[in-house]
Amino acid sequence: MAKHLFTSESVSEGHPDKIADQISDAVLDAILQQDPKARVACETYVKTGMVLVGGEITTSAWVDIEEITRNTVREIGYVHSDMGFDANSCAVLSAIGKQSPDINQGVDRADPLEQGAGDQGLMFGYATNETDVLMPAPITYAHRLVQRQAEVRKNGTLPWLRPDAKSQVTFQYDDGKIVGIDAVVLSTQHAEDIDQKSLQEAVMEEIIKPILPSEWLNTSTKFFINPTGRFVIGGPMGDCGLTGRKIIVDTYGGMARHGGGAFSGKDPSKVDRSAAYAARYVAKNIVAAGLADRCEIQVSYAIGVAEPTSIMVETFGTEKVPAEQLILLVREFFDLRPYGLIQMLDLLHPIYKETAAYGHFGRENFPWEKTDKAQLLRDAAGLK
């Protein structure tokens, strides 16, 4: 592939699907705070004037679902009816059951190391050296644009902004290297009284220019700011939101494959989430070690079985050591059994609500973003 374009999108914390993700993970965090061994599968649905929280939860903890929901919506910024959604007046419904005992008997073990996977499935992790956080540039900058939108909305720089927003960035590549940005799309919900011209100028100056590196912008870069001309109705009034509907936004923006499992609302016994984090950790350490420029890891599981059913390493021809050696290094330095990866990444803590907007990867405060195995891998591979 010589010259080509690649596009990724992101959505803000006020997007309906992301509201749902954040509520699900806020419930998970509140439970893990009291009961680290809880089994949680929490799903959320949001629509005009209402939130429905459901799922299967087995725990000794008690949490106030309604209070957690209202606080989460309030923090996002939906605090008045003219925004189409109000944390103080929306209805909060709960439909929570317990996890099936048939699943429990496959997961729980007398020996924790033999803890089985909570379900079958395949998960992918990815890393590339095209950015400082070892993530693909298109999704990295799409996230940063909507993060900036939230920042200038909340700090009062652009007080007419509202919580719902989407971004999309198209990068130009030549022989695998970034040569520029071809197109930028940013759509943001706004108050009724701001005109289109003022909005476009402010978004360009306060959101786009501070985030996108000037060396990647040129006279042919196309900018689409609120291209429909109006975005007053947004959030749950504009669209219903569901947990787990933004799995590509949550991961690599389409640059890597995806096993199909969503993350939010799931405790770490669910390998959909924990093994995807572990696969990112493995891929990132391989790239950080200089063993490859790009790396994709696939891992798969059978329900109730501890050992992965498969591990695959793909380096797209960028490897500096033989592929067979990479597989051996992964097996030697990373414990990808469910209990092993939970311990390796210290996952039994309330760290998940923060993951639920702006991507689960590429933010250094998460334990799966550490590169503490990079030097070990490099030494074991015999690289100077």
From Swiss-Prot:
Q: Where does ATP bind?
A: 15, 164-166, 230-231, 239, 245-246, 262, 266
The UniProt entry's GO CC annotations, sorted and at most eight, read: cytosol
Its pathway, per UniProt, is: Amino-acid biosynthesis; S-adenosyl-L-methionine biosynthesis; S-adenosyl-L-methionine from L-methionine: step 1/1
Per UniProt, subcellular location reads as: Cytoplasm
How many cofactor units bind, and how? Answer: Binds 2 divalent ions per subunit.
**Residues that hold Mg(2+) according to the record:** 17
Instruction: Report the enzyme's class at the first EC level.
Output: transferase
InterPro entries from the xrefs?
A: ADOMET_SYNTHASE_CS (IPR022631), S-AdoMet_synt_C (IPR022630), S-AdoMet_synt_central (IPR022629), S-AdoMet_synt_N (IPR022628), S-AdoMet_synthetase (IPR002133), S-AdoMet_synthetase_sfam (IPR022636)
What HAMAP family does this protein's entry cite?
S_AdoMet_synth1
Functional description taken from the UniProt entry: Catalyzes the formation of S-adenosylmethionine (AdoMet) from methionine and ATP. The overall synthetic reaction is composed of two sequential steps, AdoMet formation and the subsequent tripolyphosphate hydrolysis which occurs prior to release of AdoMet from the enzyme.
Give the record's subunit note.
Answer: Homotetramer; dimer of dimers.
Q: What is this protein called?
A: S-adenosylmethionine synthase
